[in-house]
């Protein structure tokens, strides 16, 4: 990508709030486009300024999933047809990421299908954050810049939480690597919750591997959907003698009844990023912005600088 090529940032309907903050950080206006909705549910995308020869960054999280994904695909297609120099999809929250493997017979692999759709539509690059599974990067045949919210969270942890009595925890075994990174970086002990599920979004039983008695526990996860796992883990920590329990997660999917569960749980605080718009329905929820991080990633892509140095852990 040429460092001299001017760039433009556009937003889909779902992520305009974040795209505006990204543009404020970059010191540039948000690009003008029109998304026209029709009575039958279809919509059409058109750019309202020339993008010929420009590097075009399209900001859109794919949640709620289907319409926002289709909107992004049409934005990509329109940009290619308008002779953009390159088209970079900026997807702070990548939907379908939990469907990254064939965990039982006769199932789809949704994350691979979405990667194929984005590639076919014509993206030249993807910038995303905290994929549910790192291997999803390999589903793409274009460069993927995988950002991590850890730098945002670590600043908050070091300035706002009691480090001398803190313990890192993961609400399930699958998040062990993620939690371990925080534990090693901060020099803190770690415990693991082991769970079994009856079905999707329903936890059957859970137990703690490790000791939390008298400690301030910080649960680490990549997303919270219905909040069943995270709140069950928090309640279990308190039952086992924890002094307090907080949680951080990159993506606030927060499907019903998540807000109610968090509000009624042992959690004293639930911290998210703004990768997904969260209409605050719970006093315990705090949202940290990732706009500056994405703005810096965009700037570095345009200037040809390293992206990996943005990562703290």
Feature locations, PLM:
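PRPP-associated nucleotide enzymes
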Residues: 1-313
